[in-house]
């Protein structure tokens, strides 16, 4: 199994960056630089309101980076797992290769890509903009990123099976990332969110992990509610159980559909 995942990982790596490998690697760095440019423009526009929006010691730039980059990783893993079965149909003719191997390889690849992107973004933010980019609690931030990885993997498996069999739901799943993006405090700080709306968003497990990630990253970060890791861990276990059970009982059906 490890050999299969290893081979799939590097196959996906080559496919991900296309035929021009050097241009693909350059884009890995160019994409976050584009994001930084956009965020810098936004930060410049609202700079005069900085002290009214952000607590002391937290820049808007780093606030946005600490939410956008982890969310991009989460979204990319879910999308890649959803498309994993259809993109590897020819490989499933070989008995050792199973869809679960593709899921693992794709999830690990996206994690590695966005981990490198995050490090590069932090390096440029610290080097050129002289911002504080070292988390105050490195282990806490790492654990939150690990929870994001696990949640995206478990959710991706569920969506992959649904995406493969239930055509009418495909459109709804496409809009899922948009909904999650605007309900997880990626852009708008929780302390600026109306209380009645925050009480509803509290049930979003991704909001918990994003807020805790920022709490571990910044000094004096204000938590608007009692966010905790146990809530997101519960959802990870629940979704992973559902996803693996659905996958296990449909693995033969997946093979049958592929052969047709």
Language-model-detected regions and their locations in the chain:
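Hydrophobic transmembrane alpha-helices and immediately adjacent juxtamembrane helices
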Residues: 1-260
């Amino acid at each position: 199994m490890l050999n299969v995942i290893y081979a799939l990982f590097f196959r996906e790596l080559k496919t991900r960056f296309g035929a021009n490998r050097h241009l693909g690697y350059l884009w890995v760095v160019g994409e976050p630089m584009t994001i930084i440019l956009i965020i810098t423009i936004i930060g410049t526009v609202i700079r005069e309101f900085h002290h009214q929006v952000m607590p002391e010691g937290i820049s808007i730039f780093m606030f946005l980076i600490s939410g956008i980059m982890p969310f991009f990783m989460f979204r990319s893993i879910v999308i890649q797992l959803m498309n994993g079965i259809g993109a590897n149909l020819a490989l499933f003719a070989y008995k050792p290769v199973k869809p679960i191997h593709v899921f693992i390889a794709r999830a690990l690849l996206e994690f590695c890509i966005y981990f490198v992107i995050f490090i590069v973004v932090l390096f440029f933010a610290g080097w050129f903009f002289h911002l504080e980019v070292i988390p105050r609690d490195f282990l806490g931030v790492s654990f939150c990123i690990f929870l994001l990885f696990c949640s995206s993997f478990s959710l991706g498996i569920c969506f992959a099976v649904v995406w493969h069999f239930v055509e009418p739901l495909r459109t709804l799943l496409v809009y899922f990332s948009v909904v999650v993006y605007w309900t997880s405090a990626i852009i708008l700080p929780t302390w600026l969110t109306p209380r009645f709306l925050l009480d509803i968003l509290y049930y979003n497990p991704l909001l918990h992990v994003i807020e805790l990630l920022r709490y571990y990253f910044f000094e004096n970060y204000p938590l608007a509610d009692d966010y905790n890791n146990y809530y997101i861990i519960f959802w990870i276990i629940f979704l992973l159980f559902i996803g693996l059970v659905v996958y296990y009982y449909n693995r033969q059906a997946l093979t049958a559909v592929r052969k047709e």
